[in-house]
Amino acid sequence: MAHLDEIRGLAEYHATRISSSPRDWMNYLDTAARLYRYPFMDQLLIHAQRPKATACASLELWNEKMLRWVNRGAKGIALLDETMQKTRLRYVFDIQDTHKVKGGRTPYLWQLQEKQQDALLNHLEEVYGLEAKDAGNLSDALMATAKYMVEENLDEYLDGLTYVTEGTYLEELEEDTIRSEFRSLLTDSIYYTLASRCGLDPLERQEEMDFVHITDYNSLSVLTFIGNATSMASESVLVDIGRFVHRISLEEMKKGIENSEERNYNKFNTLICESKENNNRIIENKYPHENEG
């Protein structure tokens, strides 16, 4: 079992690691995109301990809600629980460390299909009021959505940042420069997260240099601001996208069943008609002169 101070130290250390280069930050965002329901600090610690994790939950949730047992010897992922007056550790386990028992379930993880992209694009246009020129394809729409989220909440995201820059590379920058770089870095980070979770390749649109200013956020005190902002904005958008994808997937499944039933019905009617025709031929062949004078 880990100690509280050990995990606090891990968070501090890993913050300096993922902010040390654009590539390290992008690797972190890949994990954050899969675990978008978690807040930044949890995403940070999960990435530090299990960067390939896909679905994490507590032992109780796996056992009681999903009827999945945690594998013997599996090591829990230690997170900081600050919901109580005194900070303590809590543990989650990745789905790879579990197995189903009788009645066990696998959590639903939505996947956007290529054939669903146009429908999602139209949905984003409607929800975020995107203009047609900003939504030529899904990638454009996700970038426009990222920009929308930043402009709507920038002051809230930045609130307090300038008070904790001491000892970081941000300390030497003017407030206007910090604001401008923060806006740009946050927009690109949100887009990367959205695109990654939607199955697009962010690097078809972006390049590593888009994240060059992440190196200015070289301590947990300042990285928390860009991390929290990215996490909160991405979660808001991805929760909505997930619900939309789930809904249209169910509609497609229902339509597929209806089409299948209709095909079976038509096939059945065809077989009945063919059977009647065959019976008529048999009768005609068996009694060819019955009605002849």
Can you annotate each of these PLM segments?
Residues 1-293:
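N-terminal accessory/interface modules of nucleic-acid-binding and processing proteins
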